[in-house]
Amino acid sequence: RDSSTSRGLGDVYKRQLYNTGELARDLRQSGYEFSTTTDTEVILYAYMHYGVDFVQKLNGIFAFAIWDDSKKQLLLYRDRVGIKPLFYSFVSGQLLFASEPKALFCFPGFTPRVSMDGMREVLAIGPARTMGNGIFDDVNEVLPGHYLIFSKNTMSDHTYWDLFRAPHTDSYEQTVETVSFLLRDSVTRQMVSDVPVCTFLSGGIDSSIVTAIACRYMEKHGETLNTFSFDFKDNDIYFKSNAFQPERDLPYVRIMLDHYHTNPVSYTHLRA
């Protein structure tokens, strides 16, 4: 196959993909040859082979852009639930995009202006917000599960993934097995790393499940998981139960550390 360079394709990104190997294998079977081990080649070849909706095949968190010189199009992609941010704006007829608004502000001629609607949301429902709305005027957001296509005179917004609701018909046993598989698959895919892996263990259900799966995975590979936990100074004296947090976290952290062999690091005297 023609290389991505000869096809006039370019890619800038901020992403972590968890199925790069699977995609590369499928593309090799279709005749593509890789000259590097980076996921950039995988992304560009997948775009060439499957078209703009290739993003549906990606498993991971990402925000990236592809320039297709043959079509004179720029495509901006964002992951399904918006883990990686991606913003864009127009200044004097020029398209700007970045993973943070402050990068847009560095462009000559861009003047940041606070959005009153955005400020109302910050004060009323922060840290939550309406998807796509921010505190700056003229700073737009690529929505989760969307990609945008920009050409010389047009812009189009496409949804490639969305939540859907359907009646739950599985038995209790089937549900347990399905949820267990999805959790284990999600965590173990993300354990592949060239730097040490750790978890933030708060004592809640989410972090405890992630820690349990990660710990077992690392034990199978002869390694020990690093965990980090914290508690506030005098929290044992001043903690008050509420609907959001009926109990302190620290006792559950200790239960997890007693049950699983990890390298724990605890900060128990932080000031609020």
Regions found by a protein language model. Name each.
Residues R1, R7, D11-Y267:
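Cysteine-centered catalytic environments shared across enzyme families
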